[in-house]
Amino acid sequence: MNRRIITTLCLMAVTIGMMASNDVKTAQNLARRILGNKAQTVVFKKIDSTKDVFTLESNLGKVVISANNANSMAMGLNHYLKNYCHTAISWYKDDPIELPETMPAVKEKVRIESRLPMRFFLNYCTYGYSLPWWTWREWEHFIDWMALNGVNMPLAITGQESTWYNVWKKFGLNDEEIRSFFSGPAYLGWHRMCNFDAFMGPLPRDWMDRQQTLQKQILKRQRELNMTPVLSGFAGHVPAKFVEKHKGLKYTDVSYWGSFKDPERYRCRFLFATDPMFAKIQRAFIEEQTRMYGTDHMYCIDPFNEVDPPTFNCDSLAMLSRGIYESLAAADKDAHWLQMSWTYKYMPGWNSERMKALFRGVPQGRLIMLDYWCENVQMWKTTESFYGQPFIWCYLNNFGGRNRLVAPSDRIYNYIDNTYEKAGSNFSGVGATLEALDVNQFAFSMLFDKAWNMPGSLNEWRNSLADQRMGRIDEKARKVYRDYCERVLDVPRTYNYTFVESRPGMKKKDKCTPTREAQNEIWKEMVNLNSDRDGYKMDVVNIGRQCLEEHFYVLWRKFVVAYDCYDLKEMKRLGSEMKEVLADEAALTACHPVFSMKRWIEQARSWGNSAEEKDYYERNARRIVTVWNNNLAGLNDYAGRPWDGLLKSFYLPRGSMFVDRAIDCRERGIEYDEDSFVKECYEFEEKFCELEVPIEYPQKQDPVQLSRQLLKKYCE
C-alpha cells in the first residue's frame, strides 16, 4: 500500500480515536436501544489493535464482546444476533426487533478482523428517495444499523443548505434569492449534484433551521460510533444571481438535465476552479460548515454528475481537478476528496486518458473514488485501479427505489473476492450506494460482512438468511431461501422496474422477467413455511406482489393482441382482470408497512407548521415517486414504488384509463392514439401530484392467508 494511502487511513484513525473516547459506554447505549432489557446479557470490553477487530465468547452467563472501538463492538453484537440469535435488524425504526426468549451462549470463542478500513454508505439520491422526511427518531435507529454493520464512512449531507445560506449572504445574495436557488426538500440531492436549481422551491427557512439541528444530532452520534462522516465541499455550483452580481467570472452554463419544461429556468451555473473566486467560496463554505458541524476532513465533491464538463481537454481536466483539490486543501490542510465514479461510466466522452488526467490532477491518496455500480460494471478493472487512487467497491442495487426482486448475493460475494485478489493495494473499502432504501436489505448486510474475514461459504450465508427469517434453523426454509437467491434474486436483469409502475400504453417494451415461473413456485413454497417473523412476512408480500405484476404483464400482452385482432369481447375480459390484479396487489402490499405509502406522506406532512406548508411537503413527496419532474416525458415513474396507496389511487386508475380508452376506440371504430392518451394520462398524473386525487389505503390483512388466496386465484 503506497505511502499516501497509508497517510489517508492513519488520519482517519486519528480522527475516529479523538471522537470516541468512551467506546464501551457508547456500545452499551446502542445495545440498550436494540435489545432493551436483554442488553444486560451482553458485556463489552475494549482491546488494543491496529485493525478493526472483535471477539465473541461466553463467560458466567454473559456474552462478552471485545473490540478495538465502539464501531467494532456494534459489528460484533450484530454478528452475534445474526448467527446465534437468528435475528436480523432492519434499518427502519418501526420494524420489530425479534429476539429469542433466552439469549444463546457462544460455545467457542470467535475472532474476526476487518480486511478493509473503509466502509462507505449512502448516495446523494437516497436523501431524496428515502430520507428527506426523517426526524431524529428514524435517524437514531438508522445510525445504529450502520454501526451494527460496520459502516464507518457515511455520506452526511443533511443540513448543508443552512451553511450555503450563510455563505451566499456573505457574497451579497438576499433571502429570496438564496431560497429560490434551492430546490424543494425531496429534490435537494440533485440540486447538490449541480443537476438543476429551483425546482419545487423556494426552500422554507424553517426546513433549513430544523435540518441544521438534525444534522448536529446525526454527526454527534456518528462520531461517537467511530464513523468519519463525509461532509460536502464546493464543486463549482453557483446561483444565477451570484453570477449576475459578480461580473467577469469564468463560468459556464451546465448542460440541461432532467427533461424539464422551461429547462433554462432550472439550469445550473458552474464556476471554473481556475477563477480566483472559486477558492474564496471554497474557503468560506468549509469554514462556515466547520463552525456549524465540525469536520472529519472527508469531503464529497462531484462536479459533473450526469452533465458534461466544460472541456474534455486532458490538460484542462487535470488543471480543474487540481484547482478543486488545492482550494479544498487551502481551507483544510488535512482534506480528502471523495468522488463517485458513476458519471464516468454513464456519460459519453470519458475515455481512459481523460479520466487519468482528472484523477491524477489530485495528489495520490488524497482522492478516494467510489466504484459505484460494481455488481454490473467494475470500473477499477478498466482504469488501472483508478490510476493508483484509493477506491471503494460499491454495490448500488437500485435506481429510484424501484423494488424489483434483485439482490445478487453471488456477484457480491464472488466479485469482492476477485477484487481482493486482483485489484491491488489501493483497494480500500466496500460501500453501498443505493439510491433508495425500499429494497432487499439482506444483501447489504452480506456486503459489509465481506469487509471482514468472516467464515463461511455463500450457501452458508444463504442458510443464515433463512434462519433469520424463521428465527430458528429449519432445513426446509433453508432450501426455499437458497432457491429464492439462486433462481430469482441472483438472476441478472437488464432493467430494474416493472410494467405496473410505468405509464401504460400499446407500445411498451418487453419487460417480462426471465424468472416468472420460479417466482410463482417460490411464492407457493414460502407461504407453506411457518414463521411469525416480520422479515418472513415481508418476503411473502414482496415475492407475491412481483408475481402479480408479472401476471399483469402477461394479461397486457394478450390485451394488445386482442386489440390488434379486433376481439372486443376478449379485450373486455382481459381488461377487467387487469384491473382486478392491480386491486389485489394493492391489498397484498397493504399487509406490510414497508409497502405502505401512508408513512411517506405522513412523514412529509409532519414537517409543515400550517396547512399550506403541509400541502407543500406532500406535493414534493407525491411528485418525486410519480411524475418526478414537470413534463410528460423524461423521468416519469423513475422512482415508482409498489406501495399500497400508489397502487390503489395512482397505478390502478391510470391502468384503467388505458384499458377503457382502448376498448372505447374499438367500440367506436377508431384507432387508439398513443400520443393523445399520454397527454390525458399526464393530466391525471399532474392532478395526483397537486393533491387533487385523494390517496386511498386498503385494509390490512394477514399476508400469508391472503397470499394463499391469490396463489389459488392466479397461479394454479
Can you name each region flagged by the protein language model?
Residues W643-E716:
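Extended, compositionally biased alpha-helical segments that mediate assembly or anchoring
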Residues M1-N22:
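Bacterial Sec-dependent N-terminal signal peptides
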Residues A39, A88, D94-M103, L122-T126, ...:
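Catalytic-core regions of glycoside hydrolase
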Residues S21-L116:
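Contiguous, structured surface segment used for ligand recognition
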